[in-house]
Amino acid sequence: MSDDWDDEPIVDTRGARGGDWSDDEDTAKSFSGEAEGDGVGGSGGEGGGYQGGNRDVFGRIGGGRGGGAGGYRGGNRDGGGFHGGRREGERDFRGGEGGFRGGQGGSRGGQGGSRGGQGGFRGGEGGFRGRLYENEDAKELPPIPSSCDKDEVGAFIDQLDLSKYTTSLALIRKLRDYLLTAFKALVNQAWASLEKLAQEKRAQKAHQIRETTDMMNRLMEDMGRLIREGEHEEANGIGMGFQSIDADCRADLSQWRNLQQVVMPQSSEIRDGQTNRTSGTEGGRSGGLTDGDDLTEIQSAAYAVYHQVLDRGYQTGRRLYDDNQGALREDSIPTEDREHPENNQVDGSTYGVTRFLHWLSENFVTRHEIRAVRFGSPHMVFQSYDWPESPKQHISTVHQKGIFYSQPLIRTRIIATVASEPNNSSSGQLSSMVNLARHQRSQNQETPDGIYVSRYNATGDEETPCSATGVPGRVVALRASSTPNEHRSDPGLSFIPNLTYEDGTIPSLAAGGAASTPLAPSLPAEHSLGLEMDSNTLVVPADADETRLVGHPGSTVVRSRLGGPPASTPLLSFRPRLPVIDEEHHLRFTRVSRELQMSVAFPPEETTLSEQREWGSIFRPRDEMVNYAEGPPPRQTQRARRRSRTRRRRNRIASAASPQLTPERIVRREEAFQSSRHIAATFMSSLLQNAAGEVTTSSGLAVTRSVKEITTSVHITRNVLQEEVPPTTEATTTSLEVAQATGYSDSGACMQSAAFSQDLPVVAPLEISGNASSDQASFDQALALLPPINSTPIGQHPIAVFGPKTEIEIKPQKMDISNMMNTSVPPMPMEVDEVPLEVSNTLANMSDHAYVTDIQILPSLQLNSLNLVSTNITDNAVNIAPSTSTNDLQTPSDRRTSMQNQLYRVSMNDLAYISQHANVVRLMVDRQEELGAQVSSLGPFKENSQGALNFSTMPAVKVYDPRIIQNIQKDKMRVVHGLFGALIRQSQVDMHNAPFIRNRKDALMAYRFLLELKTANIISLSSDGRFFGLL
């Protein structure tokens, strides 16, 4: 009986007030009604037993079950409630005369619930009152419905009168418990039935899916077998299955003519000459085959049956359960003859297919949706296609004409050669050769495994003008693609994969393509523009509408392999994102694809080319690198000395300092920057000249001057007192100077020509005091670190180019001729103005027998703070004046010591940094014009009250090599990251408690950054260096 009450609701009334059952007083007390029990409850007679339960030990109260007696079964004190049961005709749980706890009959139990119809229970506030039949107005609740049937539940609701149970809170609770108990079983029963139904549906659907899968697997196996059989069949281009059908048709021809079975549905509209096969009677077959019909009709019928079954059955089988669980939809059956009337090629009756396990009957048709053949042309069903990987061509006797459904790719490679026609253009015109390999590439990717060509090329058949400039050539049709990934874009530059083999041939790609021819001879290393080119550098002609560089007629001839009609998009409608810096693009090709950017906003006629520059001379190939190890000087060619003549001393008129910059000098400066000379060599030479010119000699004489005086030219004249020098000495030194000056002019190390040197008097070497014992090994090592730079002499007179000099006359004493012949002094740079020269001087490739005849103080380079490398040197300029000792002559050891001191004053750390980060210099040189335009757009540089320059900021990626940041030390990156993170998160940072400082090295790096930030007035730093924060 206890199982019947397991699902009863639990009412918690542990918070009851007053009259609680005291277990200490009546722990095992027994109470009985009219018939006393023995502690377990009376079981006979009219009485009901009640056994008191202990609340602490969770005792249960067993009620008597005697005939007619009111049984009461107590529940767990803590977990369950009292469930009072009332038998008909008997009293409730409490006896009429006695109450529990003191005669008033108030059971103040905190948890019990009474099921009796008459006894009221106050669960939360009190117990049963000590009055018999307290709730006489309580009525019987209707019976619980046995099922969820609509009629039963409706009857239950009609019998339930809710108005009778709203008079007190106890009745409402009683009604709630009853309804929960009543409908809980109904809900569980309905849920179980739903789960059972869903399980059955899932099992049925799984069974149907398995059947469909098996059927489709069988169909795919048949199709695969037919395909495999057709791969090795070359007789008629069809498989063995069709041959077997042909054999069956020949054997059972009479059977096919008299076939009565309906095997395939036909549309309602039947063309003339065809038989209505839907009647199913013999009379409907009057228009069938006759004895004179040819067997080709049977063969064509077999073709139609196979293609319809394989194509339609496979496609509809995969949609079997997508639409109406595989059932046939009447509206899904198209009228094939109405849409594609040419597909219905069956004249006569159809027949069964022995390849399948079943006949094509009405049952088979109803299980599939009939769809039209998915081909653009019905003739494509019967075409035989060549396998791409097959080297041989299949023979088809049915249809000999092949179908090419893909556009063949045209592979083209062009090699530019110099035309035989003479160059008759004016000096203002430039060559139409455009270095496409360097000007039309993208900076973001490397050179792809292929080439880019123009569409204005040539074929081998027709000779038409190539462009408006009159360049003879031929047109070529390229594939409509600018990149390998965009096959439908408008062609501007066509991507050509690497199709050129080592023997210089290009394989034929299209069907029936022309045979390849060997490549044309390569271009010479130097042409009219002075651009260095090799055999792999592509040159294309420029159109007059596409660029402002107008070429002369007949300048170049561009040849190609295959071609067609020319395209319409101009060549220069594509603009690269960044100029290309590819030092060894001609040494190797990679397979990285190239991305081009098309400019839509600008018309082609407004497009101009970027400035041409000799990148090949700046970045030399590896095999042309010069060994910097110092060796013996090159032997000078023997020249015939002519008889020297005695010259009189001639005083030069002292003139003013170098004039200010004029428009002509500014033009010369721009030409020097934009000339075809060696830009990187000039930069390095200028750096070394600044370093060498700002060196303080070790002599005791020094002239202090201000910064403004340094900017003016200070020269030393070449005048020597004639009366103090014997004629023999003068003649000897003059001839020696002439020979040496000529040699220097050839090598580019000296700035004066031989003819000009002959007209100048001989100057004695300056005396520079120093220690005679010099470190020869250190001097040689310093010389070896200096890179050699090839240069060419200036063809103009120095005074005419750079203006007159200021005369400072020095009169040395008599020279020793024997020492003069044995001297070995590397010469100093002679005459340098602030204008960037076209000639570059270096100290590493000069001869040993040269005289320092002229010294000029070098001012700082005016690069608007873009030359980051030479900034430190120019800012720390010192006042220099040559030593003017006139007491003693300079010995060879003194001169070597002086030169050694000069070389050691050059910052070797800066030179090492430049050599390690050559890409930075290359990037700065390449983007000099762009960076200058950005800086000039921010406004001119003006000096503030302190005399410092106002600098502007720009992205560091434009002036720095990103690899410097990528290859940064991990510890430095961690310290910088932690430092800036602390500055952002905290208003004030304590260095003693900084988590990113682990050792002294971290603290050193952190304080270095802190001092830089403090100098830039970004942070505030305490006097002891412990606390810092953002301003």
Curated annotation (Swiss-Prot):
Q: Where is the composition biased (Acidic residues)?
A: 1-10
- Return the Basic residues bias intervals: 638-652
Phosphothreonine PTM positions read T27
The highest taxon in the source lineage is Eukaryota
UniProt biased composition (Basic and acidic residues): 85-95, 328-342
Q: Where is the segment annotated Disordered? A: 1-129, 264-291, 323-348, 623-661
Localization per record: Chromosome, Centromere
List keywords of the entry alphabetically.
Answer: Centromere, Chromosome, Developmental protein, Differentiation, Meiosis, Phosphoprotein, Repeat
One GO cellular component assignment for this chain's record is:
chromosome, centromeric region
Instruction: List residues, modification Phosphoserine.
Output: S22
Tell me, according to the record, the phenotype of the null mutant: Premature loss of centromere cohesion and high non-disjunction of both homologous and sister chromatids at meiosis I and II.
Which tissues is this protein detected in according to the database?
A: Expressed in spermatocytes.
Broad class of where this protein is predominantly found: nucleus
Q: Does the keyword 4Fe-4S apply?
A: no
**What is this protein called in UniProt?**
Sister chromatid cohesion protein solo
Which organism's genome codes for this protein? Drosophila melanogaster
